[in-house]
Amino acid sequence: MEALKQYIRQMIDISEQDLSQLLSTATTRQYKRLQLLSSPGTVPNEIFFVIEGIVRVVITDNEGEEHTVHFAIENQFIADYSGYILMQPAMYSLQAVQHTAAIVLPRAAIDWGYAHLPHGQKLGRLVAEYYFIYQDHRIKNIYARTPAERYNSITDVFPNIHNRVPQHMIASY
């Protein structure tokens, strides 16, 4: 939990009491290799903060082929954000690529933070801005780079990923 506390403190000014209240319903969960953190078809009600391991965001096309949309490594948030925000069934699977530990923030904690923290809205905005910029870069990479260039540049965003993730997952990215 300390890694998440440190992350939040770097983003906003927050009292120890408010931080404790925000994280009072958060839990740390362990996920085995290839275990799902969340599945398509269910409304996401949690946001995950990776403290150890790697999570892969996967979408499966109509032919059953998996496509890696995103990875999350240590000290990053991950969720099916569209499903979470719109309160609609998820389109993505979140899968632990290796043994993964994540802090799970339930919707109630996030909602409490927005409503009660002096800088709760700012925290949410900063996380959303990070994810928006990541997705924008991802779209540019898909359309402006060759597959080889994308493969070679993935370490800019995810250091050491070639040693941590099977090649077929990187190739589908």
Q: Each predicted region: which residue ranges?
A:
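Alpha-helical bundle regulatory/interaction domains
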Residues: 1, 109-110, 124, 131-133
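Cyclic nucleotide-binding regulatory module and flanking cytosolic helices
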Residues: 1-27
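Short, Lys/Arg-enriched N-terminal segment that forms or immediately precedes the first helix
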Residues: 4-5, 131-140
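Short beta-strand segments in beta-sandwich/barrel cores
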Residues: 27, 54-59, 77, 101-102
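Glycine- and acidic-residue-biased ligand/ion/polar-headgroup-sensing regions
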Residues: 34, 45, 49-56, 74-75
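Short phosphate-coordinating micro-motif centered on Lys-Gly-acidic
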Residues: 37-42
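Cyclic-nucleotide recognition modules
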Residues: 68-126
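Phosphate-/nucleic-acid-contacting segments
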Residues: 145-173
